[in-house]
Regions:
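Aromatic/basic-lined ligand-recognition segments
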Residues: 103-183, 190
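Secondary-structure boundary elements
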Residues: 78-89, 128-142, 200
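Broad, structure-driven detector of short, well-ordered beta-strand segments within folded domains
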Residues: 20, 32-44, 170-184
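N-terminal ordered "arm"
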Residues: 1-39
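Long, hydrophobic, well-ordered secondary-structure blocks that form the structural core
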Residues: 59-115
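Cofactor- and metal-binding active-site motifs of prokaryotic enzymes
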Residues: 30-67
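Short amphipathic beta-strand/extended segments with alternating polar/hydrophobic composition
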Residues: 31-33, 58-66, 89, 177, ...
Length: 211
């Protein structure tokens, strides 16, 4: 999904063009709109991606079980062709390093082997979404300071769910409340708060370990 977004959306500071926004009505994550009315959606529970047109999921989705990354790339190209979108724009490159991502046509995604893990991950994300949705009401006394509109986004680079609780156009400062399912330093799920500004650099993330 991040590759599709990176192929068709203009780059934004801190790779915000890659953010997958939570859509409450459909209970899924979607890219920002590109080429006026297209999005790419993600259903984590089923490990399924699909195109959306004018906010509506369309048929011919792609499920990752027993399919290679090369198969996924071919699916993208076919779907782009069906929508008269420029296939030459699609690229597998990303603006960040991802050394453990599957590539090529030699290894299948075995989503069904991780059914319990996907179910647990989906449940954790849903619970966190509900918690983040309560933040505006909890911070009513300082509502004028809150970032509007309030977006909940899944960040592909860190695979963290993030909510911008405060944003300053003047200074570029942002205070973000987030949830992580775990990483190589902290294997268990955890919540975090990070403070970033315009000088934020991807290799100096707020979640980096500092002994």
């Amino acid at each position: 999904v991040a590759r599709g977004a990176n192929s068709f959306l203009e780059a934004m500071p801190q790779n915000q063009h890659l953010s997958l926004l939570w859509v409450g009505d459909s209970q899924d994550f979607r890219t920002r709109y590109f080429e006026k009315h297209f999005q790419i959606g993600l259903n984590i529970r089923e490990l399924e991606i699909y195109f959306c047109e004018n906010g509506v999921k369309v048929p011919h989705s792609f499920c990752f079980d027993d399919r290679t990354p090369a198969f996924a790339e071919a699916w993208y190209l076919v779907e782009l062709l069906h929508r008269d979108l420029d296939q030459s724009k699609f690229s597998t490159s990303l603006p960040f390093d991802s050394p453990f991502m599957l590539m090529g046509d030699t290894q299948d995604h075995n989503a069904s082997l991780y059914n319990h893990e996907l179910e647990a991950l989906h449940a954790c994300l849903l619970k966190s979404v509900r918690l983040f949705q309560r933040i505006p009401s909890l911070l009513t006394p300082i509502k004028s300071l809150l970032h509007q509109p309030n977006k909940i986004a899944l960040e592909p680079e860190t695979f963290t769910l993030e909510y911008t609780a405060f944003s300053s156009v003047t200074t570029g400062q942002k205070i973000i409340v987030g949830f992580s399912a775990g990483d190589h330093l902290r294997p268990k799920p955890f919540y975090f708060i990070k403070d970033i500004n315009q000088n934020f650099r991807p290799k100096n993330r707020g979640l980096d370990y500092r002994p």
